[in-house]
């Protein structure tokens, strides 16, 4: 692939730029470590990935509801009931999830050469809070699930990003950690992509539903991504 043609890099946000596994576990642990129970992190994360994908594949729900319902369904399957208030409190925790340590340096470096965009399975108000944690980096546009009323891997989210960019697909590179949500649909649409294969903080598949997409490139950190595209386009 000739990186010289790339004008825009779009990013998945949660799991790629934001450390969602540590973020969600911080608020899920009190719900599942009680009454003598201690549900393993691997089980919590894998159930999260499975249930979230099920909810997102049905009729559109705001992500706030997806998060709350996911927590409640995990509790139901673990015989540890989660109230609607506890589910809502877990949803609110997203605003506290923090960027990975390499996120801001990599984005700032990439922004010197490329336009940057976001394609995220999230509500607008949630991303508005996350955006503050990514300052001073500026994004040309942000496509949320709320705006298009669908969740990745729906092609609509990516098609809207292409439309807003004003570019052809061969001028866009998409970077993400989820094969299921991002790499597979990017491939189907002919958008070059980089799999940011961040190892899960726990053994197993982590919080993203397993997928089979074959990436154009693979890196393990955003620092590697920055080095890859910067050296190739120098």
Placement of each model-derived feature along the sequence:
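Asp-based, Mg2+/Mn2+-dependent phosphohydrolase catalytic module
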Residues: 1-9, 39-40, 81, 104, ...
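N-terminal helical cap/lid subdomain that shapes the substrate entry/recognition surface
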Residues: 3-101, 112, 127
């Amino acid at each position: 692939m000739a990186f010289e043609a790339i004008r825009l890099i779009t990013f998945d946000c949660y799991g790629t730029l934001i450390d969602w596994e540590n973020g969600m576990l911080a608020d899920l642990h009190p719900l599942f470590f009680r009454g003598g129970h201690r549900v393993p992190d691997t089980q919590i994360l894998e159930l999260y990935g499975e249930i979230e994908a099920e909810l997102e594949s049905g009729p559109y729900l705001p992500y706030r509801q997806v998060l709350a319902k996911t927590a409640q369904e995990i509790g139901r399957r673990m015989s540890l009931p989660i109230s609607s208030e506890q589910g809502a409190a877990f949803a609110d925790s997203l605003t506290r999830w923090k960027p990975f340590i390499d996120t801001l340096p990599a984005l700032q470096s990439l922004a010197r050469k490329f336009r940057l965009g976001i394609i995220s399975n999230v509500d607008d108000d949630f991303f508005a809070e996350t955006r503050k944690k990514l300052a001073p980096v500026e994004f040309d546009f942000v496509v949320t699930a709320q705006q298009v009323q669908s969740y990745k891997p729906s092609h609509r989210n990516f098609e809207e990003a292409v439309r807003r960019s004003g570019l052809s697909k061969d001028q866009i590179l998409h970077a993400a950690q989820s094969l299921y949500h991002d790499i597979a649909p990017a491939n189907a649409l002919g958008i070059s992509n980089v799999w940011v294969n961040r190892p899960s903080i726990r053994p197993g598949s982590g919080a993203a539903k397993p997928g089979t997409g074959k990436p154009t490139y693979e890196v393990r950190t955003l620092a590697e991504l920055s080095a890859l595209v910067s050296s190739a386009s120098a």
